[in-house]
C-alpha cells in the first residue's frame, strides 16, 4: 500500500507501556488517561499518544506514545501534567506496569 502525498522518513522515540489496573479502578484510570492524553498531545515534541483497553481483559491497558526525540520524552516525564495525572493519580491504581522504549523509522508527513 502506498501512502498518498509526500512522505519523509526519520527516526522517532516510541514508548509502549503495558498496565495492569487494580480491580474496580478501570473507569478512573481511563478518565485520567483521557486527560493525560490531551495534555501530552500538545507537547512540542509529541507526535502521538494513544491508549487501548483490552477486549479480553478490561484491566489490561496499553499506552502507545511517540516523540520526535528521547529528550522530548524526558520533557514529558518532567511535566506538571505527568506528575499529577501519571505519577500521583494513575500509578497508585496500577497492579503492574511495564515500560518499553524503541527507536525506529516511521513515516512523517
State the predicted function of each range:
Residues 7-13, 55-56:
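Short, flexible turn/loop "capping" segments at secondary-structure junctions
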Residues 17, 29, 49, 61-63, ...:
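Hydrophobic packing within well-folded, soluble alpha/beta domains
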Residues 51, 99-104:
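Hydrophobic/anchoring residues in structured secondary elements
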Amino acid at each position: 500500500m502506498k501512502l498518498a502525498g509526500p512522505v519523509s522518513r526519520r527516526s522517532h522515540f516510541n514508548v509502549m507501556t503495558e498496565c495492569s489496573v487494580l480491580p474496580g479502578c478501570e473507569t478512573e484510570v481511563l478518565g485520567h488517561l483521557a486527560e493525560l492524553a490531551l495534555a501530552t498531545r500538545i507537547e512540542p515534541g509529541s507526535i502521538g499518544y494513544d491508549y487501548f483497553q483490552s477486549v479480553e481483559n478490561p484491566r489490561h491497558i496499553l499506552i502507545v506514545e511517540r516523540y520526535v526525540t528521547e529528550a522530548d520524552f524526558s520533557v514529558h516525564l518532567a511535566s506538571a501534567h505527568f506528575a499529577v495525572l501519571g505519577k500521583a493519580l494513575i500509578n497508585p491504581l496500577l497492579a503492574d506496569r511495564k515500560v518499553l522504549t524503541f527507536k525506529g523509522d516511521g513515516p512523517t508527513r
